[in-house]
């Protein structure tokens, strides 16, 4: 089925794939893929997070990795804070650069739990932008906060 999807120009969201399925998908489809809500296993060893090799494969094909705010995917003890968010961003930037990262918060899967320092009564998008602006250049934050996803969609989903 994946090879047929590739023939039709359909890209994949690899966020919920097992490691084996991830590599098989990349073998069967030459298209860029997106991990809409995944973090980095090197920072938090959870099987839903991407290995460094997976992240590099996504970036090498022009794909995008959406950073997830679920505490259990940010920190191995499940109690995350804004420093954990920054650790994943730092790792992603050093590994794949700022053109392969995006927001992919997956807040509907958090059961109402957010990283400490994130106020659920305010715009989460705006709060994370503020957090990133405290550490990274505006151009990097703009890419992560939306430009990268827009470019991916223009190049792969919108005809």
Give residue ranges: language-model regions:
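Acidic-and-aromatic substrate-binding clefts and catalytic sites of carbohydrate-active enzymes
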Residues: 41-49, 75-80
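Histidine/acidic residue-rich metal-binding segments in metalloenzymes
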Residues: 1-34, 47-62, 83-99, 126
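Active-site beta-loop-alpha junctions enriched in small/polar residues
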Residues: 10, 15-19, 38-41, 70-72, ...
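Mid-to-C-terminal alpha-helical segments outside catalytic/metal-binding sites
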Residues: 119-159
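Outer-membrane beta-barrel pore domains
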Residues: 76-82, 111-119, 132-135, 143
């Amino acid at each position: 089925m994946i090879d047929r999807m590739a023939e039709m120009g359909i890209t994949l969201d690899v966020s919920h794939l097992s490691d084996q399925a991830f590599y098989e998908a990349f073998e069967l489809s030459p298209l860029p893929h997106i991990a809409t809500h995944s973090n980095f296993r090197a920072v938090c060893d959870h099987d839903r997070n991407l290995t460094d090799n997976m992240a590099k494969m996504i970036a090498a094909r022009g794909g995008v990795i959406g950073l997830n705010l679920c505490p259990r995917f940010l920190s191995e003890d499940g109690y995350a804070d804004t420093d954990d968010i920054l650790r994943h961003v730092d790792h992603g930037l050093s590994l794949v650069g700022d053109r392969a990262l995006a927001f992919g918060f997956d807040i509907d899967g958090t059961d109402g739990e957010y990283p400490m320092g994130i106020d659920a009564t305010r715009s989460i998008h705006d709060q994370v932008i503020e957090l990133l602006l405290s550490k990274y250049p505006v151009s990097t934050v703009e890419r992560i906060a939306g430009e990268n996803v827009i470019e991916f969609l223009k190049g792969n989903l919108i005809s």
